[in-house]
Amino acid sequence: MRPRARVLASVLVLGGLLVGCGAHVPPPPPVGLASGLPRVALLPLENLSTRNDAGDRLSRVFVGVLGEARVCQTVQPGDVDQVFMELRIRDANGVTRERVPEVARRLDAQWLLAGTILEYGSVRTADGEVPSVGVTLRLLDARDGRTAWSAMRVITGDDHEGLFGMGRVRSLDQLSERLARTLLADFRLPSPRDSTSTAGARR
């Protein structure tokens, strides 16, 4: 190889190594992990806010955070919408406790997450407007619709504000992600043994 070509090849290899070191690539999930986890479907959120896009935006955030936690498989929102259309269910209010098993069976899910958007927008403070997000969530057992877990949280952009405005969140998307992580921090699926014991106690 000519000296000039050898130098050029070395530069290209070094450049590739530097790019690889600088880029952050999340590690792939362990082989077989996802297929062994229970499936959870997030139903369309009831939207009590004034923003028509709140449901879609928050659903994407919650599905993403749940996926990162690797405690369950999340059913894609598009699949949920398809089942709702096939069953002629207009919104989550149409999923009564009696219909939970049917919906879950169509989604091949062991658990359903239902919830309500209480707030999605901004509130006026002495220092100006800040984003505000509030959500309730309930985990429903696919067999009978019982509530196995629930949580509620309302936060604003200045909840963690410190001196000189440090820590204030001004982005609604950023605040939504913070809410989802906070709300799901203690999210755990009941173990099969606990679920079976509870079901037996209801007979």
What positions do the PLM features span?
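Bacterial N-terminal signal peptides
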Residues: A9-G20
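Short glycine/proline-enriched turns and hinge-like loops at secondary-structure junctions
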Residues: D53-G55, D127-V130
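Short, surface-exposed coil-to-beta transition loops
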Residues: P131-V135
